[in-house]
Structures are given as C-alpha cells and as structure tokens.
C-alpha cells in the first residue's frame, strides 16, 4: 500500500486511468463485435456500415495508447478483408 501522499495520489490516479481505459477498450471491442456480427449474418451493407463506424474508433484508441497501433492495424485489415470478401460473394 502507498504510504507517502504522492504515492497515494499516484495510486488513485492509476486506478482512475485503469477504469477509464477499460471502458474505452470495451467500446472498441463492441464496435468490432458489431462488424463481426454483420459479417456472420452475411449482410454486406450492414457489415460495411459497421466497419466504417468502427475504423475511426479503432484509430482513435490506438492514437491514445489504449490499444497498440499494430493491434489496431491487424483488426482493421482483417475486418476489411472479411467485408470485401462478403461484398464480392454477394
């Protein structure tokens, strides 16, 4: 446990950041999940719309350091590949 006042403050700040970052990570997962659901449902238009909404959110969270930039790129690339394949099949 933190003993000095500055250590107590840092612990409090770290906990606050941790909970805030957790909610942002959850939001990213939700946007990704919406795209995946549309892809699984074979709905090309809905998948494209969900992908367009998800990309800026993923990028923003990568810029803020909530997720790693390579992880963001990987998600975008894979989702885009699935959406394009779905549109090509339709």
Curated annotation (Swiss-Prot):
GO MF, any single term: small ribosomal subunit rRNA binding
Location of the region described as Disordered in the Swiss-Prot/TrEMBL record: 1-25
Entry annotated with the keyword RNA-binding: yes
InterPro entries assigned to the protein according to its UniProt record, in alphabetical order: Ribosomal_bS20, Ribosomal_bS20_sf
One Pfam match: Ribosomal_S20p
Function noted in UniProt: Binds directly to 16S ribosomal RNA.
Family, as annotated: Belongs to the bacterial ribosomal protein bS20 family.
Protein name: Small ribosomal subunit protein bS20
Species: Pseudomonas fluorescens (strain Pf0-1)
């Amino acid at each position: 446990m933190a003993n000095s006042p500055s250590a107590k403050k840092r612990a409090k700040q770290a906990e606050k950041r941790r909970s805030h970052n957790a909610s942002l990570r959850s939001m990213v997962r939700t946007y990704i999940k919406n795209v995946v659901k549309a892809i699984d449902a074979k709905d090309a238009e809905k998948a494209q719309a969900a992908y367009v909404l998800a990309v800026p959110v993923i990028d923003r969270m990568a810029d803020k350091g909530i997720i790693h930039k390579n992880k963001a790129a990987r998600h975008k690339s894979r989702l885009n590949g699935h959406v394009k394949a779905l549109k090509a099949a339709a």
